[in-house]
């Protein structure tokens, strides 16, 4: 858990497998009352989510927030687009970095900080299959080395 983070509600583990994360930043989320109740109950799925910069605003798409059971008529559509709250300079920087460079914005983590839902947004570049295999191979080698070092240190 990074410095200053609150209770982690959801993580997107697949994003770190499919993308190389270049930079991360924290964004607020504009949610309705029933949506925040569902988020606090950890009923959120970030798996297919992505963010886009449109007209000077950042929008989060394909993130599923399950309808709140007791929300009845106030429930929103589960996969509606949601606005992300960032400073103007951050939005301009993201727009420059994602425009025509093969970079994308992926949600990495949702957590509650000081009573507000925050999203850890990653600036990412897609991995090819051979990059994924290389990452897996490197991780297994590190585990083997750690296992050997642990065995040596226990003697």
Curated annotation (Swiss-Prot):
Quick check: keyword RNA-binding in the entry? Answer: yes
Q: What keywords were assigned to this record?
A: Cytoplasm, RNA-binding
In the record, biological process GO terms are: trans-translation
Q: Name one GO cellular component term.
A: cytosol
Going by the entry's taxonomy, the superkingdom of the source organism is recorded as Bacteria
Q: Which GO terms describe its molecular function?
A: RNA binding
- Which Gene3D superfamilies does this one have? 2.40.280.10
Location of this chain's protein in the cell: Cytoplasm
Where along the sequence do coiled-coil regions lie? none
- What PROSITE patterns does UniProt report for this protein, alphabetically? SSRP
Which protein family is named in the record? Belongs to the SmpB family.
| Functional summary from the UniProt entry | Required for rescue of stalled ribosomes mediated by trans-translation. Binds to transfer-messenger RNA (tmRNA), required for stable association of tmRNA with ribosomes. tmRNA and SmpB together mimic tRNA shape, replacing the anticodon stem-loop with SmpB. tmRNA is encoded by the ssrA gene; the 2 termini fold to resemble tRNA(Ala) and it encodes a 'tag peptide', a short internal open reading frame. During trans-translation Ala-aminoacylated tmRNA acts like a tRNA, entering the A-site of stalled ribosomes, displacing the stalled mRNA.
Name it: SsrA-binding protein
Please tell me the species this chain comes from: Streptococcus pneumoniae serotype 2 (strain D39 / NCTC 7466)
